[in-house]
Each structure stands twice: as structure tokens, then as C-alpha cells.
Amino acid sequence: MAETNQDMNSCGCAGRHASIRVVLTGGPGAGKTAVLEVIRRAMCPHVHVLPESAGIVFGGGFPRGTSAELRRPAQRAIFHVQRELEATGLAGDHALVVCDRGTVDGLAYWPGADDMFASVGSSLGEELARYHAVIHLRTPASGQGYNHANPLRVETAAEAAAIDAKIAMAWARHPRRFEVAATVDFLSKAAHALALVRDQLPACCRSPASRS
């Protein structure tokens, strides 16, 4: 019988794990999708990757536009979908739940000076505390390979860079925030991000079990 990815990457852990959440974030075109796919394929079955809530919301047809009247309800919808996605991560024996963005990312897209978290009955401190660590992939400039291919991506390279800066500000108070710099060599960027994710794992899950 052929081995599956999970068989090949099995860590051989026998005990149950205490689950933690780690956010992989970054502006549009930062490379999150590619890095998350590597995580799914390369890490043990106790690493669980959640889908992006914004992709679910907008991919499902939620109205999208530039006015505050459209952006506020969209960000509230994304917040609630993100919270419920994270709740699903409690099912199963997951040592690490990797979130494709977190609830705090919404601050980078929220219009105006009013408090986004007050509008959903929460606070910045409460949301930051939900996550063990945050890994921020910085968005490349146009000359560094900014990718326009994603049909849900509507930002120019300049707009993406501005959003990326706002994301950095939103997460700045998190005590375990790591940055992965933009680089022309995406493989080195991905390797750096993967190493940071692996560092958050318990020792028993950091490498596949040896097989004869």
C-alpha cells in the first residue's frame, strides 16, 4: 500500500497534545498560500491548517467594495467566520493550529477611527491573547515578484504594501511576533517561515518518526 503524506510525515507521538494557535499573516501577495501548502505537506498530522476566512466570505459572494458602508460589515463577517474556524481547530488532537490570518488582521482593513473590536464585543488585548505566536510574511514590492494572479486579489503592489504596513502595526503589541522579510528568492523566505512554524511545535512533533 502506498504511503500517504500523513504516513510519511508521522511524528510517532503517543500522547495527546495541548493545542496552541499560530497566525501566519502578511499583506496581499506575501506568499501565505504557498507557505501554508508546504506546511500541510511537510509537517506531521498534529499540525492543522485553517483556511482563510476572508476567502470564504468573499469567495462565497459577500458584497465587497471600497466604501465604509461595505467594508465594516465585511470585516465583521470575516471576524466571526475566523472565530468559528478557530473553534473547529479544537476538534482532534492538534498540537498546532495554523491560522491563515487572525482576527487582529481586520484592523488593517477597517475604515475610520472607531473601534472595530468594540463593534464585535471584544478588545485588541483579548484578540492578541488568543494566539501563541504571529509570523508575518512581508509583502514584496513590485520588482520583487508581487503576484497579481489571485482572482480575489484586487490590490496594486503599492496598495498591498500599505496594507502590509497596517498589518504590522495591528500586531505590533504581540509578544511573540516574528517577521519574514520579502526577498526575490521565495524559497529562502518559505524556508525561514517553515522554521519559525516548526519552532512553535512541541519537540515530539518537530521531525518525522524514524522508519526502518
Where in the sequence are the language-model features?
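Extreme N-terminal, non-catalytic leader segments
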Residues: M1-R21
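Hydrophobic anchor at the beta1->P-loop junction of P-loop NTPases
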Residues: L24
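P-loop (Walker A) phosphate-binding loop of NTP-binding proteins
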Residues: G27
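Conserved lysine of the Walker
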Residues: K32
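Short amphipathic alpha-helices and their capping/turn segments at secondary-structure boundaries
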Residues: L36-M43, Q75-H94, M116-Y131
